[in-house]
Structures are given as structure tokens and as C-alpha cells.
């Protein structure tokens, strides 16, 4: 679609780029009110006019405020008597205070927003500037000048300003209009697969003050923020088209980017303190797709689906019978989660690959295809690192980009860089494959591409850096999301040993990726024995201090799906699990309790005796029963029953019945890596 501006911009979730309403702060005296206006007018007077778009509008308004600032200077001169204004004068100054706040907010907003987005809104924003001048004119018209002891010069300035404001008309610079037309024509041409002329692109971005790769990168970030702030599909599509234009222009005009030496992945969810309201009551993990059940409780869709499909007809949290099994999306909560992730610098896929995402506009898709084609052609030249980094960043951005990159044949070309001796190139290559693997159909492409899987495994085992190894582990985690591939990966000894070694030897972030990948692979029962033989219990035990949540989840999954060999391997961890129950977070405490329940059921009295020997274990169990999560309380109650039967000497069947609780395998919100 061509971007048009025939109608005002739609409502937005944050403060819009329009003037709004403000309440004047309560000031105790006329002197304080005058001083407040003096400070506000001088603050606005010191502001720089907008540099490229709407410059004349902002400059004119700032100059008008400068005239007012000189008047307030005179009003604050020392006087022999207390300043007392009439009621009408006081009200006029309060209204002027509100206008000042609105002027500052509008100029601030225009300075922060994307320049391209501002260009598309010039008619609306120009109206906002004119509206402020009109409001200022109204206040000046009714201002009782005779109430103030002003010099003739000051009164002349007020009269001059009043006339300027009353004569003001809405104005849009013809150069801004022409520049906007160039942008919209360029985007419209893409719809018909007409490649933009490079000289036209250079002229557009130079006129916007975006004349290098860094400024275009910043513009992309501002446009991505704009997409988050818009609430209707039309505006989101317009912003997406602009992002496509800037990405393509940045690449073809200034070449592929080179990553900074200290370039790192975003913060992960495991490092963040997730608000309780954002956690699913079943898994206690960040909800990816929150939905509301019949009782009004909110759960993550995947978790509650599994609960219902397992035959339960009650609400997990309240225990009430569900009158129906319909799930209503909680979009308000999802938006809050997305905003929180953005504030925490945690990438989060706003929609899954399966649906719910607005159909991408044709212009954005065409820009992406053109950019991918340009980058793939560049892969054969010497500076491959910059090209692969650009593909990495593009694959991180959205579903369309992942599909376009894979369809263009990038995966076989990336495979050859997995064995490179250049550490940064290896990291970029494996991370690009990782980001591509998020798309379901790309998992098949990766698994079927000659050398791709073996290349990733080799990076896992002998990568040049811990980051490369960690991203290889994360790639295996992603591929293991398909059941058939999970079995195939689990049969490869190099995968099993590589993940266990990384969990034992790597730094904390790398251990986390390894443990999460192991957790996904042991979801397949036939893989459990191989991991036990490779020493997964020892690796998990060593990680209890650094990564208790992931380590306990791995132990729980292995014990639950493994046989006596798995239980025996976990025997040495019983006391550690008891310590986690005492001091861990809610999610790890209940996971530790569930692990001990499974071990007691499968292992008999010897395991119960070992648990009973933990100092203060009964008190810990009682605390979980009384103050833990619902699932944790049930597991703790089961442990107490085991302890009582053991204490009573009932060793014939210590593994008495335990309530079967169906809980989804702990999952990781998997996000693209930049």
C-alpha cells in the first residue's frame, strides 16, 4: 500500500505526537506562578528548532515564547510591595502555564520520534503547532495588561506578539511536502517491484539528516518503537514499510554493518525478575500467549491447553469446574508483557509463527526480498563477516525476513562459515542459523541441508568462543522443538556429550543454554538414558548454585522420564534438592519437591531415609504446604506422607499412591538473538 495522510493518525498507546491536556500545578502565590512561567519560557527559548522537518513551524513558536520570556523577566524584577494579581490575571497566567507545557511537550515529542514517521505526519503536526499559537493568542487577547506594572516596551512586545499570533495561519513547508511525496512514491514503486534509484535514496535521507549507517540504524530503532506504539494494523503496516525502506537503503548505500567487538546477546529471561502477574500460574514462567478461562483466571495458552487435553475439567488455580473450555486471548496483558520485555531489553516474539500476526504489507515484503538478494550476492566477496552480521540482524527482526533469507538459499552459504577460524564470523554464522530456526519450516531446511547439523554440532563441541558454543546449543534447542528431530538429535553421541560438557565447563550464560537444550531433548524418553550415561546429573548438580531453576528442571525431567538408573544417578542430589526447597524461588521449590516425590515413588525407603536425614526437612515441607504454590503444596503433602510412612516403618510399599499432576515441561520463551 502507498502511505497516505488523508486522515489523522490513529490513537496510540503512549503519549501521541499531538498536543494534549495538562493540569496546571498548584502554586501558592502570584510570584511563584510568574517565576514558573519565567522558567518555562526560558526553557522553551533555549530549545533548538526541529532541524530538518517542520523547522519553520517550531522556530516561529520558539521565537514567540522568547518574547514572552523577556516580559516575565521584567515581571520578576524586585518590587517594593507584594505582587498580587487580579483573579482574571491569575487565571490567564495559569492557562498560559498549560500552553507552555504543551509547547515543550510537542517539540520534545517531535525531536524524539522517527524522522520518517514525522514526515508522514507533517499535516497533523503542523496543525498542532498552529493550534498552540491560536491558544496562546486567545490567552493574550484576554490578558488584563493594566493589572501589571509593565514598561511601555514590554506592553509593545505583548501587543506585537498578540498581533503575530492572531495573524498566524497553518503552514506546511513545500519542501517537506515534496520530500514526503518522494518517500511515498518510492514505497509505492516497491509494490510493483521497481527498485529505488540510489541517488533518490541519498537525497531523501540527506534531507532528513540521516547520512550514515549509524543514523539509519537509530532510525530503524525509532520506527520499531513506533510499531509497538501503534494500535491499528494500517499504521503498523505503514511503519513496517518505512523500516523496510531504511533497512534496504542502509545496506545498499553504506554496505553491511560490522559488529562492535563487545557485541553481545540481549539479556535473557533467566536474568530478569519477572513480575508475578506475567507468570503462568501453572509453569510460573513468562506467558507468551496469555488466555482467560471460564473462571476468569489467566494462563499461558500452551500450558492450559495441555492441562485441558490431559482430561482435567477444573481451573488449576481455583479448583472450580470449568463451565466451558473456550480460551479468550488476554490482549491487554500481552501488550503489557511485550512492553515490559522491551523495557528490559529482552527480545520477545509478539506473535507465534502460527497466526495472530497481521499480514505483512507487500511493500515491506518486497523491501526485505530486495535486501536479502543484495546480501546473498555479497556473500561471495571478501568482507563476508559484515554481510553475515547483516543477515543475522535481519533474521532477528521478523518472520518474513526469516522466510525470505531461507528461501533465497542462505543456509548452505552460511554452513561454510561454521568452520571458519575467524571467531566473530563463526558467531555471526551460527547465530544467523539460530534465528532462522525459529520459523517452523526453516527447521526442516536446516536439518535437510548438507553439513548444517554437523556444522552446528562441531561449533558446540569445539567452537572458537563460549558465545558460539552457547548459540549452537540454543540452535539445537530450537531444532528439538520438532519431536522427530528431538529423537534424531538425541541419538547423536556428539550432541549429548557436547551439551553435557558445555553445562559442566561453560560460563553461566553458556551453561544456561546447554541446560535448556538438554531439558528439551530429555522430553523424549529414549534420550534420557544417554544423557544419564554422559553425566548429566553431575553437570546439573554443579549448576545448582548458579542456575537453580534450569538445573532442578533438568533433574526433574530426567528422573520423571528415566528409570531406576536415573533415580540412582540423582541420589547424590537429594540434599541439594532439599536446600532448594528451603531457599529457592517458587518455581524451583516446587520443581525440587516434584523431583523428590518421583524419586521416593521409584526408589523406595532408602531414598526416603536419605531425604529424612536432611536437617529441618519437615519444617520446610510444612512451609511449602502452607505458603507455597498450589502445585508445590500438593507435592509437599505427598513428601510428608512418604516421611510419615517411613517413620512408621511401612517399608513394604513406601511408594504409595501419589496424586498425578499433569504439568507441561518447563519451556523457554525462545527469542531471536541479535
Swiss-Prot record:
Keywords from UniProt, A to Z, are: Repeat, Transferase, Ubl conjugation pathway
Q: Where is the U-box domain?
A: 273-347
For this entry, the protein name equals U-box domain-containing protein 16
E.C. code = 2.3.2.27
Repeat (ARM) positions are 399-438, 441-481, 484-523
- Per UniProt, the enzyme's principal EC class comes to transferase
PROSITE patterns, A to Z: ARM_REPEAT (PS50176), U_BOX (PS51698)
Query: Origin organism of this chain?
Result: Arabidopsis thaliana
Whichever gene encodes this chain, its name is PUB16
Q: Which Pfam families match?
A: Arm (PF00514), PUB10_N (PF25368), U-box (PF04564)
Per the record, the domain of life is: Eukaryota
Describe the task this protein carries out: Functions as an E3 ubiquitin ligase.
What reaction does this enzyme carry out catalytically? S-ubiquitinyl-[E2 ubiquitin-conjugating enzyme]-L-cysteine + [acceptor protein]-L-lysine = [E2 ubiquitin-conjugating enzyme]-L-cysteine + N(6)-ubiquitinyl-[acceptor protein]-L-lysine
Instruction: Enumerate the Gene Ontology biological process terms.
Output: protein ubiquitination
